[in-house]
Amino acid sequence: AGQVAVRVILISQDAANRAWLQGATYRGAVQTGDVMPSGAIAEVLASEDPALAPGDLVYGDIGWQSHAIMPGAALRKVGPHRPLTHHLSLLGVAGKTAYHGLFQAAGIHAGETLLVSAAAGSVGSLVGQLGKLKGARVIGVAGGPEKCAWVRDTLGFDECLDYRDESRP
């Protein structure tokens, strides 16, 4: 597959980006001047790859930059059937982490109780919602009454414990 020139439309900002700055993960540390690795949605401007044409929308590990030239094989077309942001959230790093952590690592089942730390965060919020869809009782842990209210009322968790509430034993 040939090279493709793209213009970035949306980038994903994930908790992993902070860890990548420190080099404490499966990737080497991001150095000054490096492009921050990240999933991104981009528009194809020019293509030497027969599978991609100018105007196509694509997803890939493009990073935090306005434009890039990269192998077409590193990109996948984005279909028009869902909002573009879904490719960076539900289908991005946070969504994949939530899905694999809950179903492959934890193996949650209907009727079980699931405790989710960082329940208001990108991964925790998805873990809790997936747990509810699976039929689990979901208890979130978050910092502050506003976050706990959002976790319960908007995300649908059964309960939320405020770790900042000093009145709790």
Question: How does the language model describe each region?
Answer:
Residues 1-13, 21-64:
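Glycine-rich beta-strand-centered segment in the early N-terminal region that forms part
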Residues 16:
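Active-site-facing substrate-recognition patch
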Residues 36-43, 54-118:
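NAD(P)H dinucleotide-binding glycine-rich loop of Rossmann-like/cofactor-binding domains
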Residues 49, 107-108, 154:
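Alpha-helix termination/capping residues and helix-transition junctions
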Residues 51, 74, 82, 145, ...:
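Residue-level detector of flexible, active-site-proximal loop/helix-junction positions
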Residues 98, 128, 132:
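Gly/Ala-rich phosphate-binding loop of Rossmann-like dinucleotide-binding domains
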Residues 124-125:
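N-terminal Rossmann-fold NAD(P) dinucleotide-binding loop
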Residues 132-169:
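Adenosine-nucleotide cofactor-binding segment
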